[in-house]
């Protein structure tokens, strides 16, 4: 029996433990889930919840109407966000093996940033220290994640352009970075530093919002 239970742990056949939490590190039911969310006490991977804000979903003019943002502008904004977070975390906490950002729309996945460090102790230290940080006008909420193999977490249909669930799919829709940035970060090439958007200890002062790149970046 013990061998059987071990073999189905974290799968759909497991009626005790939540398979979605095991694979993705979050669950749309949250604390109301009828199955257990076994939070790891150590892991190489951390998740920074709802950290990325897609300007196509959030950009507004002063009167509150939606502001059109082109695909090119969105990619530039995303690459800048990705580079800043990747560089900040790697320089402060240790070598990063992989970083992924969800482009889903569901509350439990939207803007989640998953960072897999080479060493478990680096992930633990990052979670402890980031809990007192602010980024882009919001408090950073980080936790250790059970996700280690993102192939099990990603929506295969989305990768083939065939997902019928759209942004509310419960598997990860990962937003890619540009090829140049991919080579720059993972090829360990030279990086340019941008002004930091991480802040420590207190809520940054609000500014008037405009429909502009500075608004999307949340510079304070």
UniProtKB/Swiss-Prot annotation:
Residues with the N-acetylalanine modification: 2
The domain of life for this entry's organism is: Eukaryota
Q: Name one GO cellular component term.
A: U2AF complex
Comp. bias (Basic residues): 189-208
Q: Name one GO biological process term.
A: mRNA splicing, via spliceosome
InterPro entries reported for this sequence: Nucleotide-bd_a/b_plait_sf (IPR012677), RBD_domain_sf (IPR035979), RRM_dom (IPR000504), RRM_dom_euk (IPR003954), U2AF_small (IPR009145), Znf_CCCH (IPR000571)
**Any one Pfam family match given in the protein's UniProt record, by short name:** RRM_1
> Which molecular function GO terms apply here?
pre-mRNA 3'-splice site binding; zinc ion binding
Q: Where is the composition biased (Basic and acidic residues)?
A: 209-220
Q: Where is the RRM domain?
A: 65-147
List where in the cell it is found: Nucleus; Nucleus speckle; Cytoplasm
Zinc fingers (C3H1-type) by residue: 12-40, 149-176
| Keywords (A to Z) from UniProt | Acetylation, Cytoplasm, Metal-binding, mRNA processing, mRNA splicing, Nucleus, Repeat, RNA-binding, Spliceosome, Zinc, Zinc-finger
Q: In which tissues is it expressed?
A: Isoform 2 is widely expressed. Isoform 3 is highly expressed in heart, brain and lung, lower expressed in thymus and much lower expressed in peripheral blood leukocytes.
In this chain, the stretch annotated as Disordered covers 185-220
What is annotated about its quaternary structure and interactions?
Interacts with GFI1, U2AF2 and C1QBP.
Q: What does this protein do?
A: RNA-binding protein that function as a pre-mRNA splicing factor. Plays a critical role in both constitutive and enhancer-dependent splicing by mediating protein-protein interactions and protein-RNA interactions required for accurate 3'-splice site selection. Acts by enhancing the binding of U2AF2 to weak pyrimidine tracts. Also participates in the regulation of alternative pre-mRNA splicing. Activates exon 5 skipping of PTPRC during T-cell activation; an event reversed by GFI1. Binds to RNA at the AG dinucleotide at the 3'-splice site. Shows a preference for AGC or AGA.
> Would you identify the family this protein belongs to, as annotated?
Belongs to the splicing factor SR family.
Please give the record's comment on domains. The second zinc finger in necessary for interaction with GFI1 and for alternative pre-mRNA splicing events.
Q: What name appears for this protein in its UniProt entry?
A: Splicing factor U2AF 26 kDa subunit
Organism whose genome encodes this protein: Homo sapiens
Q: Which gene encodes it?
A: U2AF1L4
């Amino acid at each position: 029996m013990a061998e059987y239970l071990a073999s189905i742990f974290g799968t759909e056949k497991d009626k005790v433990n939540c398979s979605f939490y095991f694979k993705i590190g979050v669950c749309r039911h949250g604390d109301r889930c009828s199955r257990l969310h076994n939070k790891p006490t150590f892991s190489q991977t951390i998740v920074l919840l709802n950290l990325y804000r897609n300007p196509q979903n959030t950009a507004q003019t002063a009167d509150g109407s939606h502001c059109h943002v082109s695909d090119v502008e969105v990619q530039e904004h995303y690459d800048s966000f990705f580079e800043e977070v990747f560089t900040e975390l790697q320089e402060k906490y240790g070598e990063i093996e992989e970083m992924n950002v969800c482009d889903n729309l569901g509350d439990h996945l939207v803007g989640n940033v998953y960072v897999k460090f080479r060493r478990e102790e680096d992930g633990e230290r990052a979670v402890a220290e980031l809990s007192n940080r602010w980024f882009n006008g919001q408090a950073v909420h980080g936790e250790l994640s059970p996700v280690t193999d993102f192939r099990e977490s990603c929506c295969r249909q989305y990768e083939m352009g065939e997902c019928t669930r759209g942004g509310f799919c419960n598997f990860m829709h990962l937003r890619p970075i540009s090829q140049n940035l991919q080579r720059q970060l993972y090829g360990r090439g030279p990086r340019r530093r941008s002004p930091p958007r991480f802040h420590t200890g207190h809520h940054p002062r609000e500014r008037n919002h405009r429909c502009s790149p500075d608004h999307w970046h949340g510079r304070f």
